[in-house]
Amino acid sequence: EVVDLGWNVGPGLMAGEVDAIIGVYWTYESIVMGREGFETNVIYPHDWNVPSYYELVLVTSEDNVENNPDLVERFVSAFNKGYEQAASDPQGSVDTMLALNPDAEIDEVTDREGVELLAPLWKSGSAEVGSLDGSRWDSLVEWMKTQDLVGDSLVAADAYDSSFSK
């Protein structure tokens, strides 16, 4: 049975409303739940024969790309610069987030722990920030077709545009 917990996934799991959760940020919820004495076991989909996939991607409409290419290009460029800076100074990225969001409710301790879990992933691999591997998308789409998650007509290359990343 699938249960929609909304954004209340950690408390829902800890209260026994569900046996497992998916689609959470393992670098956040697992830390918060651990701090509350709840033991977690992070399951990585690729360990269960799900092809590797891109998790955090920038999304815009085809209309925006067509009508505002300069805006999209500048946004992607700024995003990539921020990502590269965060990868080179993870704790500094948390400092920047806190400085730019003084009124936000930010769990600084959790974010500092979480960024240390992410940092090795940011620096792994030889691909440049913002690059996409078409074969990775192809593998995921083909797997999704075998699981009846998408229709047979879906073409992976139609779902992304990496022309704004340099």
State the predicted function of each range.
Residues 8-11, 17-103:
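Pocket-lining segment of extracytoplasmic ligand-binding domains
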Residues 67-147:
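Secondary-structure end/capping motifs
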Residues 28, 60, 124-127, 145, ...:
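Residue-level signal for pocket-adjacent positions within structured domains
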Residues 137-166:
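Conserved C-terminal helix/tail region of periplasmic/extracytoplasmic solute-binding proteins
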Residues 2-5:
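Short acidic-hydrophobic, aromatic-tinged amphipathic segments that line or gate anion-handling sites
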Residues 16-18, 127-128:
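Short, contiguous strand/loop micro-motifs
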Residues 61, 133, 161-162:
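Residue-level signal for threonine
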